[in-house]
């Protein structure tokens, strides 16, 4: 029975120092399930931890509900040496005789059952049955601190089981949602989702009602409907989807084939734009007339021209602070809004850099 409970607790192995085991074993998390994880991953039997920790460990050492170490002198203090085998057996007997010992074992086995394969579940269930069949131990004297210790450890294991169960429950819920969505998609073709084959079979039987004598075999019984090929449902679903969405898919395919890659203009058009850029580098803001001329010479539309100049100015052009300004003869209000959004000046045409 002790071997089946050997993975409960935290701390080091049996060969670890009593002081180190005491520190890791006693500080039981009462409200945070996250801290419980740190205890679960490193195996140590409950009676081994208690033996290594010493009797003082469940008598107020480090517990949030007790003052700092006023019980240490009861059993020789926290800084004493390792306890004897007799004292360890005494602590073990007290824990095993406690009324909550069976609840502690049950909480531990519940943690082990989470996500376990069927054969392990069967073994754990048998172990739990054996433990339930044991007569309860005799708890002679009331020990409030041991009661608190047992209750805290049961709470810790219960919270840890919740942490273990949560991701499994979430995964099962996700799978159910996916299954429901797949059933909905399949139901669009057959109207029955996962049970579409059964519905098709039922439809076949209903069509036989009131049919002619050709549907009867020589014995007078109705002919059995033919067995449905499992792959026939998938083929039918594929056919229905293609029939319904083939036009839309065809238009998408044509659109993707015609669509040019983003930012990749024809080489000849880019060369003409770069040539204009080099000639007007001091003020690379083409007027509407120049944009129309560039569109005619490059074969691009106005949007492509505008986007190219915007990107080119952002990446490769920065106006000089001491660059002279010259008042232009004319003002082009049609360019003002574009420059206000793109350039460092308030209006295109109001000021233009001198050549």
UniProtKB/Swiss-Prot annotation:
A single GO cellular-component term from the record reads: nucleus
What's the main place this protein lives? nucleus
Which SUPFAM superfamilies does this entry report, sorted A to Z? Answer: Homeodomain-like (SSF46689)
Query: Has UniProt tagged this entry with the keyword Chloroplast?
Result: no
Q: Which InterPro entries match?
A: ELK_dom, HD, Homeobox_CS, Homeodomain-like_sf, KN_HD, KNOX1, KNOX2, TALE_homeobox
- One of its Pfam families is KNOX2
Q: Report the DNA-binding ranges.
A: 257-320
Record's keyword terms, sorted: DNA-binding, Homeobox, Nucleus
Q: Which SMART domains match?
A: ELK (SM01188), HOX (SM00389), KNOX1 (SM01255), KNOX2 (SM01256)
Q: Which family does it belong to?
A: Belongs to the TALE/KNOX homeobox family.
The protein, known as: Homeobox protein knotted-1-like 12
What organism does this protein naturally occur in? Oryza sativa subsp. japonica
State the organism's lineage.
Answer: Eukaryota, Viridiplantae, Streptophyta, Embryophyta, Tracheophyta
Q: Which gene encodes it?
A: OSH15
